[in-house]
Amino acid sequence: MNSSNAIFKTFLGSAPEWYKLCIITFLVINPLIYFFVSPFIAGWTLVAEFIFTLSMALKCYPLQPGGLLAIEAVAIGMTSPHHVKHEIIANFEVILLLMFMVAGIYFMKQLLLYVFTKLLIVIRSKKVLSLSFCLSAAFLSAFLDALTVIAVIISVGTGFYGVYHKVASGSTFEDSTDISNDDKIITNKKILEQFRAFLRSLLMHAAVGSALGGVMTMVGEPQNLIIASQAEWGFIEFLIRVAPVSLPVLICGIATCLLLEHFKVFGYGERLPRRVWGVLARYNVLQEQHMTKQDRVKMAIQALAGIWLIVGLALHLADVGIIGLTIIIICTAFCGITDEHAIGRSFQEPMPFTALIVVFFTIVAVIVDLKLFEPIINFVLSADPHSQLALFYVFNGLLSMISDNVFVGTVYMNETKAALTSGFISREQFDLIAVAINTGTNLPSVATPNGQAAFLFLLTSPFAPLIRLSYSRMIYMALPYTIVLSIVGFFALEYLLPPLTELMTNWGWLIAR
């Protein structure tokens, strides 16, 4: 084997050869397009290539191919290291959240698995179970960050999967096994596939539920805080102003959840296999029998940490990541986890995704520097006031499907605030547009994993390959929700928001500025 073959073989490891050739081709053509064709076209080409690396997440983790594309983009001048640093600092809350909150949830896994195992055993109806996952995710996302909620759901799902996988592999509950290795599973493969489908559907219901709840309050999503700050809305005012759109969408989202389970379409409807239920029930009984006084104290501490988590985030007592760090300290200190390596394991899952998010911010910096969204933004702001709400909603939604919804919401909100300051639009129109931006960035963005950080975190988590949740499958399973949420949101924005906002202002519920 010569040197070039050896380099090609080690490049991107076990990724397919055609994929390696694609990435090499991208790296060759990008500078040529940038210097000899058009920086604008080169920018959109880079965005398309980065989305491609995300869609191939199960073939190769996107950090390496996406990172190489980002490094080259900086090297050829599509953006600067200074601007990348600026984007990272501007989104530092998200990085802190990923580093500490996800690790904090790791130390609450014992309590979460105990509670959700009880839930899974008691609720036998798949419709009720799906609805409970969707609604609990929606409720939690209204007060917590959607990423935190998804981290909880992933932790629980991994726990369920691990319990059954051990038994299916011929091991005991106490054995330490590699749950990514199916070699020892011979007779239970069909049941395992059914269980994977069951977990996929629950996870997708919860993921969409996090978007349904996240749109409702100013703390539900990072961009909501930016919108509330620019519009000078408090928690209650934000909730009331968005309600004419968010409530109809929530009701229709719940109906969609039930209909998908009833008709068993788009990958939904798979019930919990009876044998898996038996394994989980046996595991639950065994846990109860072997639970010591010390175990109960540990779970009580985790429960208190959970209460602090909800209260701290709902009242915004500190940044999300800082609260996550307090969870790590409280749970490890009072549960007796003081070994450095034991603590380090909690950071294994979030760190690769944190690095990927930083690469993503580099792509965002390219979008800003090359003004890729500027033609669309200018078109919307120059449109007739009567059609502005619809256009803001549609273009926010479309851009949020391919880019970070925090970035899209921030850019549109800054431009709209500038239009208000210059007297280009009225305050009443500004308030309505702010709602359109909020709902536009939060609802249609469920269409793809790149739209919402929580969805991207789910796709790139170690749990996704275990349950065979790929990029294309996520899009397919999210499709009915995307259609319903987007259409209902559009009509509520057009026909309910203006008259109900005027009515609530007349009632004194809203302040006319």
Swiss-Prot record:
Q: Which GO terms describe its cellular component?
A: plasma membrane
Q: Does the keyword Oxidoreductase apply?
A: no
UniProt cross-references to Pfam families, sorted A to Z: NhaB
Q: List the keywords (alphabetical).
A: Antiport, Cell inner membrane, Cell membrane, Ion transport, Membrane, Sodium, Sodium transport, Transmembrane, Transmembrane helix, Transport
Q: Which reaction does it catalyse?
A: 2 Na(+)(in) + 3 H(+)(out) = 2 Na(+)(out) + 3 H(+)(in)
According to its record, how does it sit in the membrane?
Multi-pass membrane protein
Spell out the subcellular localization from the entry: Cell inner membrane
What's the chief localization of this chain? membrane
Q: Please give one Gene Ontology molecular function term for this protein.
A: sodium:proton antiporter activity
What residue ranges are annotated as transmembrane?
21-41, 43-63, 88-108, 137-157, 202-222, 235-255, 299-318, 322-344, 350-370, 389-409, 477-497
Q: What does this protein do?
A: Na(+)/H(+) antiporter that extrudes sodium in exchange for external protons.
Q: Which family does it belong to?
A: Belongs to the NhaB Na(+)/H(+) (TC 2.A.34) antiporter family.
Q: What is this protein called?
A: Na(+)/H(+) antiporter NhaB
Q: Which gene encodes it?
A: nhaB
